[in-house]
């Protein structure tokens, strides 16, 4: 039996992306509860801007996270977080414009988000999820085995 090569980078990136999206949505909800504010406070944007922003951010997280996981350096988590933040901000503007909002209102919402607690929440969740994905990709652990599943030469 050959030693385990660890988790494949595409699988680690997939799990990290799902974890990022879940943590970000939870973080936004909890921050909204604590601060009694909306994530996107501009009513003219509707829900489309937030949905678009999260989808764009998750796609960029997956793409940059995959690259960081393949390289295996933990500093890559910072670059993934920076790219994810930029993608979320672009997603707010694009989603707002696609839903029919005035472009000035959409850009204003980007500015409001950029100076809110939600930006910090998004940065931390992206960095933590990217770090976890990199750690998962670097590990050489294998699944647990019963004694009778092991090869005879290992005993």
What are the residue ranges of the model-derived segments?
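Transmembrane alpha-helical segments of multi-pass membrane proteins
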Residues: 14-19, 75-92
